[in-house]
Swiss-Prot record:
It is found in: Cytoplasm. The keyword Heme does not apply. Belongs to the RRF family. CDD domains: RRF. The keyword tRNA processing does not apply. InterPro entries: Ribosome_recyc_fac, Ribosome_recyc_fac_dom, RRF_sf. Gene3D superfamilies: 3.30.1360.40, Ribosome-recycling factor. GO terms for cellular component: cytosol. This is Ribosome-recycling factor.
């Protein structure tokens, strides 16, 4: 029973970490990364469709993304979607390829982005701590129902805490990498 709780806790914390990675990947660093455009939705036959399903996005160089649209008729819709996104990008089309130059980040903007990254990191840590709290509540319920002893409860809670510490450390590593990426460019 305790092993199931630990396994479930680890899986839920892994999902929290993956969510954090996804959110942080969307934060622009000044370096061209195809994942920057992952959140963009394009109007396609009346319904919003992810850009990834309609085009291929690659980093042409350190400051330019190249978006190759599969269907020529969608070029203007894709261009409009990129332009109206809150990323502050100005695409230009040439044939079936849309080039998206990334403007350099100002020092002030970098500081703002670091604050956003830290906020996302804190949300990730909160999610991980909430998972820990749920696991500890389940363990306390087992003790209350006399399914485990107090020693087993203490041991299980210590193990859950070790798992939590590992995941919080991973969050800190992700944040440090992103901050370094923002400052080094």
């Amino acid at each position: 029973m305790i092993n199931e709780i630990k396994k479930d806790t680890q899986q839920r914390m892994e999902k929290s970490l993956e969510t954090l990675r996804t959110h942080i990947a969307k934060i622009r660093t000044g370096r061209a990364q195809p994942s920057l455009l992952d959140g963009i939705q394009v109007e396609y036959y009346g319904s919003p469709t992810p850009l990834r399903q309609l085009a291929n996005v690659v980093a042409e160089d350190a400051r330019t993304l190249a978006v190759t649209v599969f269907d020529r008729s969608l070029i203007s819709a894709v261009e409009k979607a990129i332009l109206t996104s809150d990323l502050g990008l100005n695409p230009s089309s040439a044939g079936t390829t849309i080039r998206v130059p990334l403007p350099p980040l100002t020092e002030e903007r970098r500081r703002d982005l670091i604050k956003i990254v830290k906020g996302e990191g804190e949300q990730g840590k909160i999610a991980i701590r909430n998972v820990r709290r749920d696991a500890n509540d389940q363990i306390k319920a087992l003790l209350k129902d006399k399914e485990i002893s107090e020693d087993e409860e203490r041991k299980a809670q210590d193990e859950i805490q070790k798992i939590t510490d590992t995941f919080v450390k991973k969050v800190d590593e992700i944040l440090a990498d992103k901050e370094k990426e923002l400052l080094d460019f």
